Amino acid sequence: MTRVLFSTVYDPEPLLERWAATDQMAYRLTRGQGIFTLEEHAHSWPLHLLAQNVEADSVMLEWPSLEEFEAELSAADWDYVCISFMNRDLDKLPLMSEAVRRLCPRAKIVIGGYGVICLPDAEAAKRSADHDFICRGEGVHFLRKLLGEPDRPIQCRLPQSGATLPWLARRSRGTVGAALAALGCTQKCPFCVTSFYTKGNLLEVLNVRGLYEAMLYYHDVNPFTSTVNIYDENFLDYKERVDALGQLLRDDGRYGLRNLSYFTFGSLSAISRYDPEELLLNGLDTVWIGVESYFTRLKKTRGENQQGRLDLDERNAFTADTFRALHSLGIKTIGSWIMGLDCQDRVNIPRDEDHFVRLNPTFQQISVLTVEPAMPIGRRYDVGDAETRKYPWRNYHLYGQTFEPTDFTFDELLDRVDGLYGRMYQELGPSLLRMLECNLNGYRYCRRSRHPRLREDKATFFERRVRGQAPILPAVAELGPNPAIRGRARELDREVQELFGRPEEAQRVYRDHLLRKAEAEYQLRGEGERPVRTDAFRRYEYGPQSSSPRDRKPYVVSRTRPRGYEERRAAAPARQAAAVAVP
């Protein structure tokens, strides 16, 4: 039997010495929200997808130390060692390759992941890190071909992620499933790594039936499953697939719309093809929308009837209407916005920021432009190629310097990013509050609807969400960032109790518990950030997968090293933009 070792790059480096690189809630989606900043545990899903779709005895390592990686190399006679990496990890790859050659010389080294865009040709790849094979596309079919295995449908039964308030639990329960619908995007945004990786093509991984079966699996094995993330850079662009999946979800006899929902990505141009109620009936719970900038000319930010022309005011009014319409039905949003685009300058940046705040996204990603040296945008910004680049690989993340701005210094870009996160918290409140408001909108809308699936199934779904999230309201009412937000929380608590009744004894005890824990955390940290928390190491064992029972997890977790806090190596106080006015 073939033996394969899969591994992420060792010891992910904290971003700006402030956040764990794998904690997307802390460093981007709920960043800067004081004690209401969430903490996420995530998984290296691409490697899990590979391990559970080949006929091999496999071990998969998530975020080991170099010592743990070397110990695993020495523990067995591996046939293949597969290492997944991103651009910022490239300096660590040679050390891992050297360890394989030294400790397991018979093994073939396979490298892959989005970091391969930094290795534009075979010679450059060999100079960067020793390897035998490099995957530059969809990994499952690549690996099966390498191992001499026949093709068959891809299964997707990945470990579940989750997010929580870190002062409430040491580790969040896994409640969010994941399903990979496709790689790549046909929009070809100039800064988009995933589109460049697939040369602007869409590489389907799971068809509609595969997505549906993956969603059922997560609910079958875990009654606490809340939603499933469908990964496809613009899933909503493919209306036939969205409608077909929605039909399966609505007609499902076990779970239906009372339980089945998903997060995915959708451009403004894609969303414009739907009536918002269609999306609700199709199971959409949360959508990531790339706003990017008030002044961008990207076609993906325009409605279907705006593709042939560009009127910025009209386009951005459409954007605001889209966010409002989605929120009014209970569909949550993640809005992404980029600082440092060449359409921004010192004169227009306040208007750009104001526009994004007014969209009131449920969650937000506010990033700095990343200029990849191997992509065409690298030539435009004159940053050198992958081997003559001006900036170190460790900078290649959402907040690292990868180009020289023209209208701002790079520190000013970071200041404005921090300031905008802070402003959104002050003016819009914590994302937990925005999410609850949105779910309450969904409940009201569905209860009024004439459509039976909305009035019965989806209203039940939203009621469960509101009841589950409402216990945080006393903490927001007491410790929110300002009187306006605290007042909103009290009013929302009153509305919830009018709809669903006063909390029962057990609920009151839990609300009081949350408030006491929140007060203790606020006394300890105020509005400051928590120390960096190191990424958890986990070792998974997989066997041959073709006959693996569908209703059971296809892996065993055989060893863990829990996350732990570490001292910051350099002081990194939260930046504040001078222009932020706190109401």
Language-model features: where?
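Radical SAM enzyme core and accessory elements
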Residues: 2-21, 70-80, 382, 400-583
